[in-house]
Design a protein with these regions (language model features):
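General structural feature for long, well-ordered alpha-helical segments within catalytic domains
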Residues: 5, 29, 73, 99-103, ...
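Charged helix-capping and loop-helix junction motifs
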Residues: 64-71, 97-106, 156-157
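Catalytic cores of alpha/beta
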Residues: 1-13, 102-141
Length: 163
């Protein structure tokens, strides 16, 4: 994305932009963007996968390996002002095998006052929503809805996600 595209997005009514791949080429993009639109309007996504005992960062929809360890990337990101961090476990994404609580805890301990949203593997039959509500500010779900495991209405009623 470039600033012209971002300007068009915000002029069209958006209040937040989601950034991932671009940061691997220009991490200072966050500062440039924040100076114009404010940190609260930035949502940073980290796509990660466990590889040889460590979590590593990926980009381009989880297809490109960055060779950057997750913990190193989190340390760098803590120097920037953005409102939300989305962590995606790409090995669990679309698998419905449950969220990765170990990964959530690892990230939660290392981010400075950012809203944390998790994506990857949610299954309403096995995940304890009360634990997730304590650890997360948001949860991204898709396949469980697509496969009709539940509806958003049922999710809302059953789990009362509102904090």
């Amino acid at each position: 994305k470039n600033f012209e595209q971002i300007r068009e997005i915000f002029e069209s009514g958006a209040d937040k932009i989601h950034i991932n791949s671009h940061l691997f080429n220009d991490l200072n993009f966050i500062k440039k963007f924040e100076n114009i639109y404010g940190g609260q309007s930035i949502s940073v996504e980290i796509q990660t996968k466990l590889f040889e005992g460590s979590y590593y960062c990926f980009y381009d929809r989880g297809r490109e390996f960055s060779s950057i360890k997750l913990l190193d990337w989190l340390k760098k990101l803590n120097d920037f002002n953005f409102g939300e961090l989305i962590i995606t476990d790409i090995e669990r994404d679309g698998m419905k095998n449950g969220v990765n609580l170990e990964l959530i805890d690892l990230v939660k301990q290392r981010i400075n006052q950012k809203n944390l949203v998790y994506s990857g593997g949610f299954n309403p039959e096995i995940d304890d929503i009360s634990i997730l509500k304590k650890k997360l500010d948001g949860l991204m779900i898709a396949l469980s809805l697509h496969d009709n495991l539940f509806s958003m209405k049922k999710f809302s009623e059953r789990f009362n996600w509102k904090k």
